[in-house]
Amino acid sequence: MSEKKSSSGEKLLYCSFCGKSQHEVKKLIAGPSVFICDECIDLCNDIIRDEASSVETVAGPRTDLPTPQELCELLDQYVIGQNPAKRILSVAVYNHYKRLKHLGKKDDVELAKSNILLVGPTGSGKTLLAQTLARTLDVPFVIADATTLTEAGYVGEDVENIIQKLLQNCNYEVERAQKGIVYIDEIDKISRKSDNPSITRDVSGEGVQQALLKLIEGTMASVPPQGGRKHPNQDFVQIDTTNIMFICGGAFDGLAKIISERSEKSGIGFSASVKSREERTASQVMMDTEPEDLIKFGLIPELVGRLPVVATLRELDEEALIQILLEPKNALIKQYSKLLQMEGAELEIRPAALQAIAKKAIARKTGARGLRSILEHALLDVMFELPNEQNVAKVVIDEGTINHGAKPLLIYHEQAKVSGAK
C-alpha cells in the first residue's frame, strides 16, 4: 500500500519503491495506484545512463565518426592541395566530436574544446574546407561575416545573431544546434588598431572580439524564438555554446611582415638564417605563425588563447588552380559542362585556355574564388544564344577567348559528322 494514516489521523502518502513518506522526500509523483519519489527517479536515471554507456563501450569507441584519415580523404575530393591544413583540421574536428561522444561518461579527465583559426589568402579554400567538413559530418553549419558584427546595443549585428542563424539552419532543434559548426570569416578585419588596449570605444574591433570571446569559450546564448527581434518580456531559447565548434578564418594581410620582423630579431648572429626575405614567399613565411604574431597583428590575447589550433593555407599556384578547374567532384568545368549539356552541347576547354584562366586569377589575386567569374565572362554570350540555337554540337574555348575576349568556337552537328567521316 502507498497510503497510510498517521497517529494524528492525517493521510500519508509513501513511495511504492523505497517506502519513504511524503515528508521524507522533496517530491512524490502519483501514478495509477502507485507513487514514486524524486530519489528513486534519480536512481533509475543513473541505472539507465550506466547501461547506455556500457552498451556504447561494447559497440566500440565510435559508430559513424570518420577517422582523421577518412576525413582527410573526403576533403581531398572537394579541396585541391592544402594538405598540412587538411591534416590539422581533420585531427581537430575528429577530437572535438570524439570528445562530445564521451561527455556523459564519468571520468577524472575533462576534455577541453579546441577551436580552429585558418590563416590564408583570399580564395585559398578556407570556407570550402569548413563547409565540406560540416556536410561530411551532417551537422548544422553557419557562415558569419565578422565585419558586420558590432557590440550589443550598437547598430549592426549582435554576436548572438550567429547562434540564431545556426538554430534557423537546423529548424530550431536545440540539441543539434549545440553540436554544430560556426565559421566566422574575415576575423582579421576586427583586429584592434594598435598593440595597446584601446581607451576609446571600438564597437566593431576589440569590442566585438570581447563579445566573441564569451561565445567561443562557452556561454548560454539567449536567442529570440523563430527568428524574432529581441524585446523585453519575451521568452528566449537558451543555447549552450560550450560544445559548438568555432572555426575562424582570415587573410591576415600584413602578418607575414610581422613574422619576418620577429624572425630577423631572433636570428641575429651565427644562428641566423642565410635565406633572404626575397627567397621566401608570404605563404611560406606565414607557415611560422606564432600566437605572439597574431596578438601583434591586433587579436586580443584571450581570443588567441581560445583558438589553439592554427592551420595556415598557402597561396594557390597555376598548377593547383588548373586542378581545381578539372578534378574536384564539383569542379567548375564539370558544372559548366553540365549546363551546356542541358542545351545539347558539349564543352571543350583547351589546355592553353586553362593556363590562361589560372594566370588571370593569379594576376587578380582572387585565388580559386576568381575562377568562376573568368569562366562566366567567357561563356556569357554562348549561354545567352545557345537556347535559341538548335544544331550546336560543341563549344570550344581557347586562349584567345580568355585573354582577348574572342568568341568561343561553335561546332555544329553537320561539321561534327564531316570531321568524323574524315
UniProtKB/Swiss-Prot annotation:
Residues binding Zn(2+), per UniProt: 15, 18, 37, 40
InterPro entries: AAA+_ATPase, ATP-dep_Clp_protease_ClpX, ATPase_AAA_core, Clp_ATPase_C, Clp_protease_ATP-bd_su_ClpX, ClpX_bact, P-loop_NTPase, Znf_CppX_C4
Location of the ClpX-type ZB domain: 2-56
GO BP, one annotated term: cell division
Domain of life the protein comes from: Bacteria
SMART domains (UniProt xref): AAA (SM00382), ClpB_D2-small (SM01086), zf-C4_ClpX (SM00994)
GO molecular function: ATP binding; ATP hydrolysis activity; ATP-dependent protein folding chaperone; protein dimerization activity; unfolded protein binding; zinc ion binding
Keywords: ATP-binding, Chaperone, Metal-binding, Nucleotide-binding, Zinc
GO terms under cellular component: HslUV protease complex
Sites where the protein binds ATP: 121-128
Family: Belongs to the ClpX chaperone family.
Subunit structure: Component of the ClpX-ClpP complex. Forms a hexameric ring that, in the presence of ATP, binds to fourteen ClpP subunits assembled into a disk-like structure with a central cavity, resembling the structure of eukaryotic proteasomes.
Role noted for this protein: ATP-dependent specificity component of the Clp protease. It directs the protease to specific substrates. Can perform chaperone functions in the absence of ClpP.
HAMAP family the UniProt entry points to: ClpX (MF_00175)
PANTHER family linked to this entry: ATP-DEPENDENT CLP PROTEASE ATP-BINDING SUBUNIT CLPX-LIKE, MITOCHONDRIAL (PTHR48102:SF7), ATP-DEPENDENT CLP PROTEASE ATP-BINDING SUBUNIT CLPX-LIKE, MITOCHONDRIAL-RELATED (PTHR48102)
Protein name as catalogued: ATP-dependent Clp protease ATP-binding subunit ClpX
Species of provenance: Janthinobacterium sp. (strain Marseille)
Lineage: Bacteria, Pseudomonadati, Pseudomonadota, Betaproteobacteria, Burkholderiales
Gene transcribed to yield this protein: clpX
